[in-house]
Each structure stands twice: as structure tokens, then as C-alpha cells.
Amino acid sequence: LYETIDQGNCEFKSLNEDIATVADDGTVTATGNGSTFIKVYNKQNDCYARVKVQVNGEQGRTQAKIVGGWNYFVALKSNGEVWTWGYNGYGQLGMSDKINRLKPTKTSIFDSKDENQKIYAIDVAAGAYHTVVLKSDGTVWTTGYNGYGQLGDGTTDNQVDFIKVEGIPEKVVAVSANYYTSYALTENGNVYGWGYNYYGQLGNNSSSTAYVPVKMQKVSNIIQISAGQNYVTMLDADGTVWSVGYNENGQFGLNNTNNYYLPQKMKNEEGTGVLKNIKKVSAGTIHTLALSEDGIAYAVGYNGYGQLGIGNNRSKYLPTKMIDDSGEVVKNIKNVEANGYSSIVSVKPSSITDSEENTTKTAGIYVTGYNNYGQLFTKNATNRNTLIKVQEDKNIITMASTKNISYQTSAIADDLGLV
């Protein structure tokens, strides 16, 4: 890593040693499948950087992923194919029609059995009724509802086939979407957005709808993005969290409910400084989760259904640690997903043996929040306001829920490819 930098002036740290480890000289060794970041601290210049490491295994081209739109799902397989199912009233399934699909169906994005196809999908995102796909050549493709320009083609015409988004002058490495806005993260750490912008969620100091990609202001070192309802939260390479757009439920963690047209940094629990050492962020409808490097999850924003997992239903304007039903902070968390008005976290096996003196949580999937149809896998329809275990550890690699709150459905997938 960073061959042009004096190695003696750098410190390296893997944010998930279950996927990759890093030696003092920067040598990376794969230890499992998945993606993580190597944190690099340059002592000479007192600055941080993070390098993404993705271990796909012998057969995989990319990391599998599931995302949910309004009554539909999009699945990215490890072989680079994109499959969709569910509601298709606007062509969001990318099937050249508007016919609903009752089971997963392969799109035309990539066919792993066609030896002539070399460019495959590496990321997917879903808005309310539109789908965004990132291909391995760094291009972005969209389909579905386009009433606010969220397809990025300069029009408001809906599409039933994937179309290429033009106007992003850098290679894209990740995409995100929610409701009527789309985002692209580039390899240089810049963020571009297009679509609905009434609350300033494009971060360009404007509230005007953008029908083609516009560059977000104030941020230039972003490594991960996650879009909520009319806002987006972003992870900086230095481990801090930025957000922009709609904040009327305090989901930015700024101890206020002001909307912002330019990105703002999340505060710490006490509100006295900036929240630091974060390795992943996830935006729900109007709440945000942030996972720290030491495996603790922070939640902030709307909490009417208990989705913050803090033991009550009061909204929080500063980030607060998530707890279990005994009131203990849940530790050793390896992944978090904020979905609609609920939250899902994955706890990895602890190196500490449980005993009468130690109540370290066992590995598995823990949930909290809105559960009117049992979408939290609890075998009942009772809302939760603390994290409760619902699934034994099976190395879950992706988790998602549809965006329709009244009839929400959730899905998880493990490293064996089972959904």
C-alpha cells in the first residue's frame, strides 16, 4: 500500500480481520470473503486514508448484495448478474416491460454464461421505483420511474430498460439511491447526485431538481455512501460522518432538526466534538446508524418505532449506543443496516468465552424497530426498541428491506448464497 510514501511513516490497520489482515509494512493477506477497509495513518503529514479491500473468493467477481425498493427487490450475485422481482409498474425491474415478477428474474445487465460479455455488475441500489446499477467499467445504468430526473438522462421519461448515465467525469466505485434521488461515489472520493433536491440532498447548495449528475460540494474524501429519505449520509476516509439534506428528525446527529444544503459532520454522543473512528454508515427512512471500529453501533434520528434500539421510543438528535433487552451495550458488531423504520445488525463470534461473569452477546442477527408484519424475523408482529437476536450466525453478507412501510418485507443472504 502507498508505495510512494515512506513506509516508516505509516501505520496500517484492518477494519475487519475476518476478511483481511495487514502487516506493519502494508502487506495485505486475505482471511475470508467480503469487503473491508485498510486504514492508513501517515504520521509525517498527520492524515488518514482508507483503501478498500474486496475478497471475492475463487468463483466470485464481486460481493453479493440485496437492496429493496417499493415492493420490489434487486439482487446482485457474486458472478456479476443482477436479478429482480416484485412490483414493476414503472419498469424498475429492467425487464423491457411493466409486468410484475413473482420470482427472481435475471436482467440483461450481464449473463455469466455468455463468454462474449466481459463487463459485469459490481453494485446496485434501489429508490422508490427506480433501480441503479454500477458496472465493472465504472459506468452507471438506471431504469424505472424518472419523474424527478433520478435516472440522470436529462429527461423525466420513465424507462423499462437500463440506460447509461452520462456526465460523471470520474470512475464510479459505488452507487446509492432512495425515493427520487440517486448518488454515485467516485474513486477520487467525490460524490455526484441527481434527481429530487427539494431539501438540498444533492449537497450543491441548491434546492433545484437535477436531471443530470451534479458534484456535491464540501466533501472530497468519501469512501462510502448511504441514501435515506431525502438525505444522504457519507463516511469520510478519516472515520467521520457527513450528512446533507432532510434533517427534521435529527438524523444528522447535530443536536438540531435543521435541513442543510451543504454536508455537515455528525457530532459525538456528548455533542462536544465530532464522532470519530466510524467504519460504516447506513441510512434508514429518517434514522441513521454508524458502526465504530471497535464494533459498537450508534443510532440517531426518528425513533417512533424503536428503530434506534436504545430502550425507548424517543427520537435522538445525537448518536446513542444501541443496547439489548438487558440494557447492555451490544458489542462485537460486524455489520449494520438501517431499513425503513427498522434496524438490523450482525454480531460476530466473540473471542471471549461466555460465563456467569461475562454476558458478551453470541453471534447472529439482531433486530429492532417496526415489525407490523413480522419483517424483523421475530415470528410475531411486535415492535421492538432494543436489539433482540433472531438468527444464529451463518456469516450473513447482505441484508435489506423493501421501502414500503405498511407492507414491508425483509431479506438476508449468507455466504452460501441462500436468501
Where are these regions (language model features)?
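Conserved beta-strand position repeated across blades of beta-propeller domains
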Residues: V67, A75, A125, V133, ...
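Short coil/turn segments that connect the beta-strands within blades of beta-propeller domains
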Residues: A64, N71, G80, A128-Y129, ...
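Short glycine/serine- and acidic-residue-enriched loop/turn motifs that recur at repeat junctions
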Residues: L76, W83-K103, T143-D161, Y192-V212, ...
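Extracytoplasmic soluble-region selector
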Residues: L1-G60
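Short glycine-/Asp-/Thr-/Trp-enriched loop segments that recur within the blades
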Residues: S112-I119, V175, G271-K276, G327-K331, ...
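An edge-strand/N-cap motif at the start of beta-rich repeat modules
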Residues: N56-G89, K98, I365-V367, I396, ...
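Conserved core positions of repeat-based scaffolds
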Residues: Y72-A75, T84, H130-V133, T142, ...
